[in-house]
């Protein structure tokens, strides 16, 4: 509990989070399967046309939009306004058809492995795999797979650096994560 916070306020917020999460996944979004503790802040939306599988300790910041399917591991942090969107939402190359009247394309799910932090306002395109232990910077647009323990940022997202300075530490961390 944070210093200076009242126990009553903490307990009320905890109960409200449990109720919001239960409502979100058992009443509103039955297409979401979860396995463990999940925290969903206000305004987070899941597209009912896709399947979502969530691990343990997954937190969605306020106003996240998951508009394409996702398989998420354990210990995932999504800051506010993170978007999972489809690359193939609109078919635009059918002769004699407008984009408006064209059928929607198929989007593959996004895979987020264990121990990933996705910063505020990041956009992740469908079919992307975000490797274990990775960090996606605020505002990044991820159009390609992210390797394990990489820190990526920019538009399009590129590797800025790795969480660990040497390959041995990265390997040990990934092995430890695979046992979790």
Regions inferred by a protein language model and the residue ranges of each:
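Beta-rich strand-turn-strand
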Residues: 117-135, 140-144
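Residue-level recognition of oxygen-bearing side chains
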Residues: 71, 129, 147
């Amino acid at each position: 509990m944070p210093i200076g916070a009242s126990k009553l306020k903490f307990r009320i917020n905890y109960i409200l989070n449990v109720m919001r999460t239960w409502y979100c996944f058992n009443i509103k979004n039955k297409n979401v399967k979860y396995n463990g503790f999940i925290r969903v802040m206000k305004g987070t939306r899941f597209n009912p046309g896709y399947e979502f599988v969530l691990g343990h300790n997954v937190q969605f910041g306020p106003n996240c939009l998951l508009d394409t399917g996702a398989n998420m591991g354990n210990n995932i942090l999504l800051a506010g306004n993170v978007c999972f969107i489809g690359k193939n939402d609109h078919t635009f190359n059918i002769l004699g058809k407008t984009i408006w009247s064209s059928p929607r394309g198929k989007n593959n799910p996004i895979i987020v492995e264990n121990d990933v932090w996705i910063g505020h306002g990041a956009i992740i395109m469908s079919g992307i795999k975000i490797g274990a232990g990775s960090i996606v910077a605020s505002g990044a647009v991820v159009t390609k797979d992210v390797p394990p323990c990489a820190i990526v940022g920019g538009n399009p997202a590129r590797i800025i650096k790795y969480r660990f300075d040497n390959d041995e530490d990265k390997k040990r961390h990934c092995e430890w994560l695979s046992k979790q």
